Amino acid sequence: GDVYKRQMVEAGRIAEAADPDIIDINFGCPVKKIAGRGAGSGMMRDVPLMVEMTRRIVEAVKKPVTVKTRLGWDEESKNIEEIALRLQDVGIAALTIHGRTRAQMYRGEADWTLIGKVKNNPAIRIPIIGNGDIDSGPKAREMFDRYGVDGVMIGRATYGRPWIFREVKHFLETGEVMPQPSVAERVEIAKEHLAKSLEIKGGRVGILEMRRHLSNYFKGLPNFKETRLKLVTLFDPNELYATLDSIADRWGDFDVSGVIPAPLSHDV
């Protein structure tokens, strides 16, 4: 436990050296190799350790520290209301809550009722950000109206659809649903996305991490199987760019307005 706490404090200091606006501790990650060794949402089984670790990081850095977590470890231990108060007590600046337990992973529907309970607890003074299943402007509006959260966070719905933020903001401001980008626009955005991924992550990781995004950019195009296979197997950036250009050439006239955005993948 102590070594882990020291490592987390050190990680906080390293993160602060990059001069970010905030330092966010992710106690929400449900992936087995993370949670199974007690990290990520595995922390929800050891609340005192979670709180103590957060306290140490808050004390070690000058930047605001925020936390992202889940409702609890499983159905029997939805302890987010207690956790929220205890984390607020040790000085976090905001809390993001994903409306599922660790045991649920990404299955079923996110339960926002507990997020609303935390937000509407008079003892809670910090901003509460809701997360889980937001995939459109209307859905974001519903969550703001129904639960009174201070913000919403969007996760899986961004895969292959980075313009969702523009869509949601537009809907919240105007009440209008934006038209979906054309195939040509998607290709341009995907190329820019790929370039940034390569620049930030390097050749190998930059391409591997783009695969789930690239295949989602073009969900719903007819006769796309072969091209999709290229997007998720090619390793040469030039071949990937050429494949993206070929999509614009071949499907440029396809009307995407009727294509429903990719459903939220549970395979994360």
Task: Cite the ranges covered by each PLM segment.
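Short, small-residue-biased leader/transition segments that mark boundaries at the very start
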Residues: 3-4
